[in-house]
Structures are given as structure tokens and as C-alpha cells.
């Protein structure tokens, strides 16, 4: 499944959550009481959620009790391989484990 471009805050470039109406909600470790889908209210045409029964404006937070319709959420964790760009390079004299240990010692001193 490929990702579709959409209007989102600058921290996001692609929508990776699709909600299909009239189906069942299946997620690993899913707890319906903790479900809260935050939608940016300043992007009214965001394709992240489509409700099949009306065109009323969506609130910022949708709870299952507010709009009760069974749906399936598919989450694609990784973008297409063509969009992966690695810009982070570790210095040659430090390995990853040394960076990790140094960070732990700086922020959590052993006293």
C-alpha cells in the first residue's frame, strides 16, 4: 500500500493511517476506551478520515461514543523505499553504543 500526499502540519509529509468505513476496528494491543484520533481542525479537507454518512465538520478529537461507526485502521509504519533518505552520520570516533552510554550518563548521573 502506498502513501498518499495530504495536507498536514509541517512535521508530517504523508498520511499513513487509512480508515475504511463499515468494517471492524482491528489493531494490535487495541483498547477501545483509550481510542482518541486527533485531527487538525485547521485542515478541513484532510483525507485522513472519511465518514460515509454525512459531510458535517469534524471536531478536533473523535471518540468512539461520538461517531459510532465500525472501521478498520491500517497503519503503514514505513514510507516507500524511494522516500527514505539518511542524513544522520555518526562521528568516526564514536560508535552507537558509546553515544547511548554518554547520553545516559549526562542526563542520568549515577549519584
From Swiss-Prot:
Domain of life: Eukaryota
Name this polypeptide is given: Putative uncharacterized protein YBL109W
Organism: Saccharomyces cerevisiae (strain ATCC 204508 / S288c)
Higher taxonomy: Eukaryota, Fungi, Dikarya, Ascomycota, Saccharomycotina
